[in-house]
Swiss-Prot record:
This is Protein dml1. The keyword Mitochondrion applies. Belongs to the misato family. Disulfide bonds: none annotated. The lineage of its organism: Eukaryota, Fungi, Dikarya, Ascomycota, Pezizomycotina. Involved in the partitioning of the mitochondrial organelle and mitochondrial DNA (mtDNA) inheritance. Pfam families: Misat_Tub_SegII, Tubulin_3. The keyword Disulfide bond does not apply. It is found in: Mitochondrion. GO terms for biological process: mitochondrion organization. Keywords: Mitochondrion.
């Protein structure tokens, strides 16, 4: 077994992660139904409930601020024992004054789920918190409320990167967060494969995540750490955008070198195809759209047939850790689709020269960058995952051919491509927007092609961050941040820009 532990940091991260967990729950099969290709033990852990019954809950830690959990309780129906007797006041014989916050009323969706009835349709107006559309029970240890800050507070906003950095330091000094929160989950694993972290990177959660990842690297050494770094894509006032940009620069500088995979995600993306209907002001809707790509591209990591996803990401030399997230929603009739993808049980590396290269440059949805000029960028490595349709058949290559092709590709600075095919289509759940996709689909399922791409666009992005940091970051931090961003940028230029410069000479 190769388990993955998830960490969810903050409101936006929890919106996305809730869609992710709802999708995992939808893959369960019961009774005599055909066994799914998904290995549920990767993300779920067995346990014992309060009444002695067996439970199966996500391997996850959910961090959020006071007031951010909505109606979700730490102790749910699986772990809460009813008490028949009054425990009394113990040694205290004085008068008790108990103050309780007004509980948040569960959404109609949650009420119907609890009663085992078909849930009503959700809308942007009825979703107030990420817990309003949650379909799972979590272990009490998974729920971690940070009481130092309150959601949407005007007095103490959780916005500055340094605030999150300081908060983690204070909490870790007092409690040792890894020992208190993470270690119980890690000790349950037979063979921990990776730590997956959802976080926003342009606010205080970026600073909190940076400290957390630093501790993870110290504790877990060479274990894979995958970071999904959410960035606000909505337009805000100029001074707020500048603060966001500074936070993003600090996050990518501090987190990406410590990660095995760092994926910046624009929420929502700048451009949308006409086939997608999206309420860009609804976090529920925008995170649902992101989940179609994020959940699809990581699907190989939770199949019963093991796939070496980490090697696919490493590419030729393992130097590229910042990847772009891209996707397309494909029509039900895939007879005209020519993009080859393959079964994980028959993996092959594919690459060729010039225009015949099978890497894909243009996608309908680009979740990482808002630069439309992608045609001139150099692609170092790309991992494609297609689901719900049959790939083109290809002539198998021998191991000798693959070795030769690999050497030729490396010598010619050609991109590396790994592609997977999974027949399991993407399900449209009742916890997701129903009319987001106009593409025709049967049984509320769609075909998706998603990709993680390491390209020279990252160098362009980092160069802009360097320039911004040089102008607005304080003197004490400026040199370290600018130099650090420059060092990261160089790995997204080496191998093709240097060759071009040499030819010019």
């Amino acid at each position: 077994m190769h388990e993955i532990i998830t960490l969810q940091l903050g409101q936006r991260a929890n919106y996305l992660a809730t869609h992710f967990w709802n999708l995992q729950e939808s893959y369960f099969t019961y009774g005599e139904a055909e066994e799914t290709i998904i290995d549920h033990d990767v993300h779920f852990r067995p346990g014992i409930g309060a009444d002695g019954s067996e439970t199966y809950t996500p391997r996850t830690l959910i961090y959020d601020l006071k007031g951010a959990f909505g109606s979700l309780r730490k102790y749910n129906a699986l772990y809460e024992l009813s008490t028949d007797a009054d425990p009394g006041q113990g040694l205290w014989d004085g008068k008790e004054v108990i103050q309780r916050q007004t509980p948040i009323i569960p959404s109609e969706y949650q009420k119907y789920l609890e009663q085992g009835l078909p849930a009503p349709a959700l809308s942007s107006d009825t979703v107030r918190y990420w817990s309003d559309y949650n379909r799972l029970f979590y272990h009490p240890r998974s729920i971690v409320q940070l009481n130092d800050y309150e959601l949407n507070s005007k007095i103490m906003p959780f916005e500055d990167w340094s605030v999150g950095d300081d908060l983690f330091g204070e909490l870790d000094k007092e409690h040792d967060l890894l020992d208190r929160d993470l270690r119980p989950f890690a000790e349950e694993c037979d063979q921990l494969r990776a730590l997956q972290l959802f976080t926003s990177s342009d606010d205080a959660w970026g600073g909190f995540a940076a400290k957390y990842v630093d501790r993870l690297r110290d504790e877990f050494g060479k274990k894979a750490v995958w970071v999904w770094a959410i960035e606000g894509g909505k337009k805000v006032q100029k001074h707020n955008q500048l603060k966001r940009d500074m936070n993003k620069a600090r996050s990518i500088h501090s987190i990406s070198p410590q990660s095995s995979l760092y994926v910046p995600i624009l929420d929502p993306p700048t451009r949308l195809p006409i086939s997608i209907s999206l309420d860009a002001q609804s976090e529920w809707q925008t995170s649902a759209l992101i989940s179609t790509a994020m959940e699809t591209v990581t699907l190989p990591t939770r199949l019963r047939s093991y796939t070496d996803f980490e090697t696919s990401l490493a590419g030729e030399d393992g130097t590229h850790k910042i990847f772009e997230l891209q996707s397309e929603i494909l029509p039900e009739d895939m007879s005209n689709h020519t993009q080859p993808v393959q079964n994980p049980e028959d993996r092959r590396t594919q690459a060729s020269k010039g225009g015949s290269s099978k890497v894909k440059r243009e996608f309908d949805l680009d979740f990482s960058y808002d630069d439309p000029n992608n045609g001139d960028s150099h692609i170092f490595n790309q991992v494609q995952v297609g689901r719900g349709y049959s790939p083109e058949k290809e002539v198998p290559k021998s191991r000798e051919d693959l070795g030769l092709k690999r050497k030729e590709r490396f010598y010619n600075s050609e991109p590396m491509l790994e592609s997977f095919y999974i027949p399991l289509a993407f399900p449209i759940l009742d916890s997701s927007p129903r009319n987001m996709f106009s593409v025709k689909h049967k049984e509320a399922k769609i075909n998706v092609l998603a990709a993680l791409t390491a390209s020279s666009r990252t160098a362009t992005k980092l160069k802009a961050m360097e320039a911004m940091a040089g102008r607005v970051i304080g003197v004490d931090e400026r040199e370290n941040l600018v130099n650090g961003l420059g060092e990261i940028r160089e790995s997204y230029e080496t191998g093709w820009m240097s060759d071009s410069d040499f030819d010019d000479d």
